[in-house]
Amino acid sequence: MKAKEINELTTDEMINKEKEYKDELFNLRFQLATGQLENTARLKAVRKNIARIKTALRQQELNK
């Protein structure tokens, strides 16, 4: 998800997306530990998406 797409979301949508990504990251870590994860780059992508969402939320908070 790109930063531009994230900035177009409402605050509630961002919070929901962040929760979805955190759940996905949790599952990916389990797959990695059990040796079932094929696409290890997905871990990095999910972490970066969480960071982008947190950054956008903070920017909105500061702009108010």
Curated annotation (Swiss-Prot):
Record flagged with keyword Aminoacyl-tRNA synthetase: no
Signal peptide interval: none
Keywords noted in UniProt: Ribonucleoprotein, Ribosomal protein
GO molecular function: structural constituent of ribosome
Taxonomy, superkingdom: Bacteria
GO cellular component: cytosolic large ribosomal subunit
A Pfam family of this chain: Ribosomal_L29
InterPro entries recorded: Ribosomal_protein_uL29, Ribosomal_uL29, Ribosomal_uL29_CS, Ribosomal_uL29_sf
One GO-annotated biological process of the protein: translation
HAMAP family from the UniProt entry: Ribosomal_uL29
Family, per entry: Belongs to the universal ribosomal protein uL29 family.
Annotated PANTHER family: 60S RIBOSOMAL PROTEIN L35/50S RIBOSOMAL PROTEIN L29 (PTHR10916), LARGE RIBOSOMAL SUBUNIT PROTEIN UL29C (PTHR10916:SF0)
Listed name of the protein: Large ribosomal subunit protein uL29
Lineage start: Bacteria, Bacillati, Bacillota, Bacilli, Lactobacillales
Annotated gene: rpmC
